[in-house]
């Protein structure tokens, strides 16, 4: 009886911890998105310099990552040759810098709610690029689902009250670069047995991003910042914003480490709906019924996609267990046969 109660208490504690990690990740992801919107939007803080903001984040995060790995030794650095770094990490850093630059730029032109709706295209982009790079197998059923997600997002875009073509182009570009980055991580790193958690990712990738972003920054934003009072650095705003960005990476580390990547995907859907509600109720962005209908269709498609991924993972785990039990049975049979032969020899 006591053992059963202890077991149930342990399960309850694990469930509470899992929900706590999910809540922390949703809160921090929510905060970073709204904070970035506040800084970049011309109607709010009015500091429309997305490259500079991204560089501040990368500089802060890479510095803290070095301290956590080299000084406090929170996690071990991954052993990596210079050639592997240049061929694998640098291309990923280039794509990440482009993705962050474009996604932050989109906040200047689009509402938070509409950006979240456009982000629903991420599974479509990841699957399509995966098929093109031969990392995913083409399946007509999966592609039909991807088309339904795209159709839902198209309806949401059609119903957008403050549609901005340039903003949509920036956000779609960010989705495309991010999807390519995710696929390349599998091809260039995971396939080679190199697994980077969010802290080691920042340690290796953030300095790359800083270097790549400095090139467009010198020509696009630096001249404007130099010639205006916008060059004044607000330590409170940018300091707290950078802390939130780094804390979000730690939250991803905790969430994926203690639960799973699929849990993060499901939590991401909840976060998107909360952001849409916040954008409509607090920021007073216009959310039309056509917006919601289109995003609802895309949401169902994304939900079905996540369900299929979960079923595939379960089937894979079950197959591994069957294989393991077969191997164990084979070893037992071999042991019995060898024991029988020994007995025959002794007789």
Swiss-Prot record:
Residues 38-155 form the EamA domain. One of its GO terms (cellular component) is trans-Golgi network. The chain crosses the membrane at residues 15-35, 49-69, 89-109, 112-132, 143-163, 165-185, 205-225, 235-255, 263-283, 286-306. It comes from the Eukaryota. Its main location: membrane. SUPFAM superfamilies: Multidrug resistance efflux transporter EmrE (SSF103481). It holds the Pfam family TPT. Coiled coil: none annotated. The modification Phosphoserine is found at residue 325. It is found in: Membrane. It is a multi-pass membrane protein. PANTHER family: SOLUTE CARRIER FAMILY 35. Belongs to the TPT transporter family. TPT (TC 2.A.7.9) subfamily. This is Probable sugar phosphate/phosphate translocator At2g25520. It comes from Arabidopsis thaliana.
């Amino acid at each position: 009886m006591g053992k059963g109660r202890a077991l149930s208490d342990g399960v309850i504690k694990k469930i509470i911890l899992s929900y706590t990690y999910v809540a922390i990740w949703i809160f921090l992801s929510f905060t970073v998105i709204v904070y970035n919107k506040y800084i970049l939007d011309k109607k709010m803080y009015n500091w429309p310099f997305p490259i500079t903001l991204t560089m501040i984040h990368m500089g802060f995060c890479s510095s803290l990552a070095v301290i956590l790995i080299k000084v406090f030794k929170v996690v071990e650095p991954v052993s990596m040759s210079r050639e592997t770094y240049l061929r694998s990490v640098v291309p990923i850093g280039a794509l990440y810098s482009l993705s962050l630059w474009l996604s932050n730029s989109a906040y200047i032109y689009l509402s938070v709610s509409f950006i979240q709706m456009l982000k629903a295209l991420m599974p479509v982009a990841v699957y399509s690029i995966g098929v093109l790079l031969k990392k995913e197998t083409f399946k007509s059923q999966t592609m039909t689902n991807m088309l339904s997600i795209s159709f839902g997002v198209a309806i949401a875009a059609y119903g957008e009250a403050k549609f901005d073509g340039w903003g949509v182009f920036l956000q779609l570009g960010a989705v495309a670069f991010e999807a390519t980055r995710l696929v390349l991580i599998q091809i260039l790193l995971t396939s080679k047995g190199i697994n980077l958690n969010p802290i080691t990712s920042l340690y290796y990738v953030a300095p790359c991003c800083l270097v790549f972003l400095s090139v467009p920054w010198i020509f696009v934003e630096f001249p404007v910042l130099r010639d205006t009072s916008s060059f004044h650095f607000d330590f409170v705003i940018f300091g707290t914003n950078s802390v939130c960005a780094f804390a979000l990476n730690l939250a991803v580390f905790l969430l994926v480490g203690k639960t799973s990547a699929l849990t993060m995907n499901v939590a991401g859907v909840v976060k998107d709906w909360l952001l849409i509600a916040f954008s409509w109720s607090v920021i007073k962005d216009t959310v039309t019924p056509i917006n919601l209908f289109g995003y609802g269709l895309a949401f169902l498609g994304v939900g079905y996609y996540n369900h299929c991924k979960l079923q595939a993972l379960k089937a894979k785990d079950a197959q591994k267990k069957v294989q393991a039990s077969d191997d164990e049975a084979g070893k037992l049979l071999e042991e019995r046969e060898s024991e029988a032969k020994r007995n025959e020899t002794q007789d």
